[in-house]
Amino acid sequence: MTVPATRKDLMIVNMGPHHPSMHGVLRLIVTLDGEDVIDCEPILGYLHRGMEKIAENRTIVQYLPYVTRWDYLATMFTEAITVNGPEQLGNIQVPKRASYIRAILLELSRIASHLLWLGPFMADIGAQTPFFYIFRERELIYDLFEAATGMRMMHNFFRIGGVAADLPHGWIDKCLDFCDYFLTGVAEYQKFITRNPIFLERVEGVGIIGGEEALNWGLSGPMLRASGIQWDLRKVDHYECYDEFDWEVQWQNEGDSLARYLVRIREMTESIKIIQQALEGIPGGPYENLEIRRFDIDRVKDPEWNDFEYRFISKKPSPTFELSKQELYVRVEAPKGELGIFLVGDRSVFPWRWKIRPPGFINLQILPQLVKRMKLADIMTILGSIDIIMGEVDR
């Protein structure tokens, strides 16, 4: 951190790691000249749990419950990236019905993540009321998650080759009802947030990022699309079944905090369009590739597999999946940006290397540059518009 030696009246202030506006255990060392920000140094690592090293000592099946602790507000995406890697390494086909179920749950998770970004973001800039509104819709999404997966958070629902269970009876109708209701909720947000002059005063022209600058910093997700770059991995990589739906990439040219807000608000509407099309066109068939249940072929050939004693032992070994000796980078469009995994197999049931590319960690790097020469109160606005979760930043 560089502090000018000529000035004697500079103040160094610690923001966090226990401040409610830090969105987790983030610490900022801020150098102030009155109300003006001279420098800002983020201090990370308070929530580091060694997730990459844990992955290298677990099979994929054993590691699945861990990944929901990265971004604990969008756990479907961390599960999706964890099963997509082995599926591509092993050339495993996912049934069409399972792919549709995944897309529906991913978009519901995207909406839930954006909602829980919107409420605290508004609270950061002084508007407390929307915080209570967003929990009304978010609880409805969690009710749908609970009915489909058994858990409101930390679902552990995705499996290599499909999902853990089929959608329960009546779930599709309930989800369609939610979609119709939520569109009126988004219109309500537009009415009392987007057109609010005090809100516009706080976010318009604050934290501007140009398109070339966003690319140079490696930004992704709404941070990139709000700077005029139409880049969405759902369109670029053609994963799952997104090509079968009619939807548009949402983007803005301005690159400020207002643009990032507008991109996320409109993304929620696009997610509803995707969910409605998926629910109406969901095919029949299996929800899991049943051949993948045979993971360990040698064990299937072993006659002891069906022995009387094996059927009644209290603790059976978990199924294993041998990773072939090759490298693979797989990514998905998470609510915060590009969530990727660099996976190196070594003909073992354990990954030789499991490198996580978290969007929040990359997007956070531009914060010191954005807040320089801004006012102290603008730090909350800019940090809130980035949308970080420290679980995935520190891993």
Curated annotation (Swiss-Prot):
Membrane topology, record value: Peripheral membrane protein
Q: Write down the EC number.
A: 7.1.1.-
Which Pfam families does UniProt cross-reference here?
Complex1_49kDa
Gene Ontology terms describing biological process = photosynthesis, light reaction
Sorted alphabetically, the Gene Ontology cellular component annotations on this record are: chloroplast thylakoid membrane
Q: Which UniProt keywords apply?
A: Chloroplast, Membrane, NAD, NADP, Plastid, Plastoquinone, Quinone, Thylakoid, Translocase, Transport
Molecular function in Gene Ontology: NAD binding; oxidoreductase activity, acting on NAD(P)H, quinone or similar compound as acceptor; quinone binding
Q: Which PROSITE patterns match?
A: COMPLEX1_49K (PS00535)
Q: Which reaction does it catalyse?
A: a plastoquinone + NADH + (n+1) H(+)(in) = a plastoquinol + NAD(+) + n H(+)(out); a plastoquinone + NADPH + (n+1) H(+)(in) = a plastoquinol + NADP(+) + n H(+)(out)
Q: Which SUPFAM superfamilies match?
A: HydB/Nqo4-like (SSF56762)
On whether Plastid is a keyword of this UniProt record, the answer is yes
Where does this polypeptide localize?
Answer: Plastid, Chloroplast thylakoid membrane
Q: How does it assemble?
A: NDH is composed of at least 16 different subunits, 5 of which are encoded in the nucleus.
Spell out the PANTHER family in the cross-references.
NADH DEHYDROGENASE [UBIQUINONE] IRON-SULFUR PROTEIN 2, MITOCHONDRIAL, NADH-UBIQUINONE OXIDOREDUCTASE 49 KDA SUBUNIT
Q: Which NCBIfam families match?
A: PRK06075.1, PRK07415.1
| The protein's role, per its UniProt record | NDH shuttles electrons from NAD(P)H:plastoquinone, via FMN and iron-sulfur (Fe-S) centers, to quinones in the photosynthetic chain and possibly in a chloroplast respiratory chain. The immediate electron acceptor for the enzyme in this species is believed to be plastoquinone. Couples the redox reaction to proton translocation, and thus conserves the redox energy in a proton gradient.
Q: Which family does it belong to?
A: Belongs to the complex I 49 kDa subunit family.
Record protein name field: NAD(P)H-quinone oxidoreductase subunit H, chloroplastic
What is the organism of origin for this protein?
Coffea arabica (Arabian coffee)
UniProt lists the gene as: ndhH
